[in-house]
Amino acid sequence: MKAGLDGGVSQHYIPLGMESQTQAARGRPREFDPEKALAAALNVFWRRGYEGASMAELTEAMGITKPSLYACFGNKESLFRKALDLYERDKLCYIKTALEAPTAKGVAERILRGSLAIQTGTTDPHGCLGVISTVACTAQAESIRDEVIARRASSDAALAARFERARAEGDFPESIDPQALVTYLSAIMQGMAVQAGAGTPREKLEQLVETTLTVWPGK
């Protein structure tokens, strides 16, 4: 990154007020941390959903101006995609670890408990960003809904492959369809996300997890 007019802009920060040389010349530009700004945007999207989050709410939470948002992150859709990347990296990392469990039931347990922890935590909004943003999407935000669905499909494919392996290893009966098991698990998780977002107590959702594991086929 080029140095600012005062010759000392850190490479870790993006200056505000650089929309024109005239503005910059009037005083030292303000600075913001893109990672912190993106985390703030994620929080807004998580609470409000894609369409429910207004540009005014986003810029206020991020502590930046609208021109600076566009310059750093692109439009609202582009910002949401970046927030979704951050969400998957920081909040859904438990899924990759879950796939390494020695049994299919162990995979399901890690996923369900990881999902419950994220959806009912004390520091983040309740519910699931993907579910919130697809359920509430209108036709105008179809590309966002398609993006979230495509990402979920990729995750489901990895889970289906793990369950295929589990069936081949005799982890559960041959009559069980791995893809149907993925659909079942996804339905439980999405239902849990909707209930968490609506304020259902964590204890109730823990009962749902326990019941799901009790009726889980196989070992």
Where are these regions (language model features)?
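Helix-turn-helix
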Residues: 36, 40, 44-78, 82
